[in-house]
Structures are given as structure tokens and as C-alpha cells.
Design a protein with these regions (language model features):
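Helix-loop-helix hairpin linking two adjacent transmembrane segments in secondary transporters
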Residues: 42-86
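Small-residue (Gly/Pro/Ala) motifs that create kinks and tight helix-helix packing interfaces
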Residues: 50-62, 130, 244-252
């Protein structure tokens, strides 16, 4: 029934949230907080890689065994993940009194806002690039999405140590600049190749935004609160992607599809200004966080 389907989606969302945050912090506990940027980057690579493979594999499973076969396959994959995780040594929890949620939110919300603003570019590419190509009368929207994915994953693979070398806020500002150029190219594209270059640059720019800001956000709290900080920080991206679609749809019906990419570039520019302010006047936090900027 619809009720069971909705309940299943809620449970799936809760489980996915714990799995994503927990696995990231597990990795940080294994390799140390110095490499938190690389851990977040690799977590994103395997997550988006699984999503990319999941769609075609899901179609094959559905064709082979129907909806029940698909459900059993997904449960089998989840069970395999549990079996692989069980024999691995546990990570010792950090002792100390945890901060209340309000205090954690107060330390990470500015970084979350910058992430939310920058996520608008990702949202309009993923949701509206097909409509954009259709409005222009062009072919190749699927290839444009492929370019975005390749640029996203490729940038993380090519620059694994960039955050440690330059600092999270510096990397974020560079990424914002690249993302802005990409969105402006898409919004003003008169030829398909301009749009494809713009999509490629947007993927490159957005790739390191999450780990770059996440490093600083997580280190703004004591170690025993880093799980709560990462979860809170991630919510800003989820909320941004949730509202980007409807709002961009309203703008599109009023002013046309290209305008939403120009508007997204403006939001990313706001993220750039906010991050520059955080760089010049960092909020009161732990000394470790200030050194990561």
C-alpha cells in the first residue's frame, strides 16, 4: 500500500543518513582528522559511483526478477555491507561531554549556508539540463550529465591533497569561482559546446565544495561532536536540493530556462562572498578549526 511504501522510504532515508555519516566518521577515526578532507572526498566518490551504477543495474534486476527480485537484490547488497563491516576493528569513541545540538548548529551553520548556496548550481544542472537542451532545440543532454559526473569524480581523484595543502576555505573559494564561470557559460550558451564546457566546469567547481567546507565545519567542534557536526552540515545541502527544484521551476516559467543558471551563479557568488568573510573573520571556534581555513 501507499502507507507501507511511504514508511519504507522514511526508514530507508534514516538508514542512509546514518550509513553516510557513520562511514565517514569511521574512516576519520581510522586515518585521523588530518585526512578528513580525503575521507569525505572518497566517501562522495563511492556514493555517487554507486548511484551511477545502481540505476542501470536496477533496471536489469527488475527485468530479471520484477519488483520482488529488485528488492531482494537491494537487501542482499545491504546485508553484504554489514557482513563486510562486522569483522573490521571498531574505532574508539572520543570521551568528553558532548555539546548540545544548538551549540553545534551555531558553529557550523555559516559553513552550511555556503554549502547550501553552492548546491543550487548542482541542483539546476541535475534537474533542468534536459529541459534546457530541449528549449534550445539541441541534442546531447544525457552526454552533458555524463560530463558533469566525470568532472565531479575526476576532480576529486586528481586533487586528493588539495584541501590539506591550501586549506578548506581557500579550496572552497577557488571551487566557487570555477562553478560560477560554468553556470554563466550554461546560462549564456549560444552553441551546444558552450553549454557542455559550462556543465563540465560546474561539475569541477562543485566537486570539492562539500569536503572543503566540511573539513572546517567538522573541526569547529570537539572530536566527540564531529558526528553531529557532519550530520548538521549535510542537512544544509539536502535542504538546498529540496527547495532548488520548485523555486527554479517557478523562475523558469516566469523568465525562461537559461535564467535559472544565471540565478544559480548569483547564489554561488553569495557563497563565495560568505566564505571570503569566514576567511577574513572566522567565527569563534576551536583553534584546530582556524588552522584548517
Amino acid at each position: 500500500s501507499l502507507l507501507l511504501l511511504g514508511l519504507g522510504r522514511v526508514i530507508l532515508g534514516i538508514g542512509q543518513s546514518f550509513a553516510g555519516t557513520g562511514s565517514t566518521l569511521w574512516g576519520v577515526g581510522v586515518v585521523g582528522s588530518l585526512h578528513i578532507g580525503r575521507v569525505i572526498s572518497w566517501n562522495g566518490i563511492v556514493t555517487y559511483g554507486a548511484m551511477a551504477m545502481g540505476a542501470p543495474l536496477g533496471v536489469l534486476c527488475y527485468a530479471w526478477g520484477g519488483l520482488q527480485g529488485l528488492a531482494l537484490t537491494v537487501m542482499g547488497v545491504a546485508l553484504l555491507a554489514i557482513l563486510l563491516a562486522l569483522p573490521r576493528p571498531s574505532v574508539k569513541a572520543n570521551k568528553g561531554k558532548p555539546l548540545p545540538f544548538r551549540a553545534v548548529l551555531g558553529r557550523v551553520w555559516l559553513y552550511g549556508m555556503a554549502l547550501a548556496l553552492a548546491s543550487a548550481g548542482f541542483g539546476v544542472i541535475a534537474t533542468f539540463i534536459t529541459l534546457f537542451y530541449d528549449a534550445k532545440g539541441w541534442d546531447g543532454a544525457a552526454f552533458a550529465l555524463t560530463l558533469f559526473s566525470v568532472a565531479f569524480v575526476g576532480t576529486r581523484l586528481l586533487f586528493p591533497n588539495g584541501i590539506n595543502r591550501l586549506g578548506g576555505l581557500n579550496v572552497a573559494m577557488i571551487c566557487f569561482g570555477v562553478e560560477i564561470i560554468g553556470l554563466l557559460l550554461v546560462g549564456t550558451a549560444a552553441m551546444p559546446w558552450m553549454a557542455k564546457i559550462g556543465v563540465l566546469l560546474t561539475g569541477m567547481g562543485f566537486s570539492l565544495v562539500f569536503p572543503a567546507l566540511g573539513v572546517v565545519a567538522v573541526k569547529a567542534v570537539p572530536p566527540q561532536n564531529q558526528g553531529a557536526a557532519l550530520a548538521t552540515y549535510t542537512v544544509f545541502m539536502d535542504m538546498s536540493l529540496g527547495v532548488t527544484g520548485p523555486l527554479a521551476g517557478l523562475v523558469m516559467t516566469w523568465a525562461g530556462v537559461p535564467v535559472i543558471y544565471l540565478a544559480a551563479a548569483g547564489l554561488v557568488a553569495m557563497a563565495l562572498l560568505l566564505t571570503w568573510r569566514l576567511k577574513k573573520r572566522p567565527p569563534s571556534a576551536l583553534p584546530e578549526a582556524a588552522s584548517s581555513s
